[in-house]
Amino acid sequence: MSFASTSPSPWLAAVLAIAGAAALAPAHAHQVWLENAGGQARLHFGEFNENLREASPGRLDQFKGVPALEQRTGTAAQRVEGQLGKDGFHYTVAGTPDTLFAAASYPLIDRSKRNLPALYWQPSARWVSGLTQAVAPTAPLDLVPTGKPGEFKVVFKGAPLPKAKVQLAAPSGWTREAETAEDGTVGFATPWKGQYVAEVKHSDKTPGEAQGEKYGEASYVTTLTFVLADGMASPDLPAPPKAH
């Protein structure tokens, strides 16, 4: 597979304006992502690259309860319960996990006014301690590091997902997009130090049932958060959007 250019200049050309469109976007246009530092993990809801974090009271309350966090260290897995905070779901993490994962539960989305079946929206988030170690996928739609520099893999229901569009947001919020190869892998240059958040989306038109209700289509969005200690100093994230 071919990797994205190692030159940071394409990133600089990809600066996104943070217009008020984010405030008008439906909830399922958002993402959830994990941050972890000092034994305290946070699951945020919004848009990392726009520095938008939904709050409680507010759109954060639309989820069906507090998602459980799965903590994995080596082959050991542990379930961690959390609490709803003002800016996200909060968790206390023990030790030094290799990866954290959370899948949030959102009510089925009624699309009957458009003569469409109900939509099952599944936002999920993964955090990894580094990119040098491969992580096994566990979610229906998962995005994991392969252990090779700058390489990631997208898996859907246990199989590599080719031609999936993966967006990587740098610590500044600047984004690049690349498509997975036939084996589900994709590569990015990561020239800056700091926190990155990658995202992949996938739609499945297979009908199913969730939360005791039937749906006609499923929409998955999964993020992967990692922090790099080495690299160039990065500009800051943009100022948060005005309250909405």
Segments and roles (model prediction):
Residues 39-52, 144-156:
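Beta-strand-rich structural segments
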Residues 2-15:
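Bacterial N-terminal signal peptides that target proteins for export
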